[in-house]
A protein has these predicted regions:
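N-terminal Rossmann-like NAD(P) cofactor-binding subdomain of oxidoreductases
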Residues: 1-158
Length: 158
């Protein structure tokens, strides 16, 4: 689902792309999808499919990202991890653009640098809430318990 959402957001924001490739695991290989108005086949993640790719977005499950991200790095692609698989890897930059904006932080953009892992939406929402509450009064302690939706653990119907 994340891949489809990513594709829609990139299209809505007019992400400047000359060649968009849809790569996925074995389960999706050969399926036809569209990028813009053009039909395209979903291909496997192989080094030759990553040649001359400026940005690689990982929106798959964590295990698949862990098993394939080095191919993108070796191909010289900038990596944006939306699967949260790389957040504990050495040298990976954890980013939360909404939080950065709320704090007035303008981070330097280093293309060709470390992979970027985007903070989990639940963490971003909690951080925004706490930052805004802190503007009203000081916070001495905050305890948050976030449970993963059961639907994330259940096998897909089929």
């Amino acid at each position: 689902m994340k891949g489809r959402e990513l594709k829609e957001v990139l299209a809505e924001r007019n992400f400047p792309a000359r060649d968009t490739r849809l790569l996925d695991d074995e389960e999706s290989l050969g399926q036809v999808d569209t990028v813009g108005d053009e039909p395209t086949f979903i291909q496997s993640v192989l080094p030759e499919h990553l040649e001359n790719v400026d940005f690689t977005f990982f929106a798959s499950d964590e295990t698949y990202t862990r098993n394939t991200w080095q191919m993108a790095r070796n191909a010289g692609s900038d990596i944006i991890d939306l699967s949260y698989a790389l957040e504990r890897e050495p040298g990976v930059s954890l980013r939360a653009p909404w939080i950065e904006r709320e704090l007035g932080i303008t981070p330097a953009i280093d293309f060709g640098g470390a992979p970027v892992c985007v903070a989990h939406p639940a963490a971003v929402v909690m951080a925004l809430l706490l930052l805004r509450l802190q503007k009203v009064d000081s916070i001495s302690r905050a305890v948050v318990t976030i449970l993963e939706p059961a639907s994330e653990q259940m096998p897909a119907p089929g």
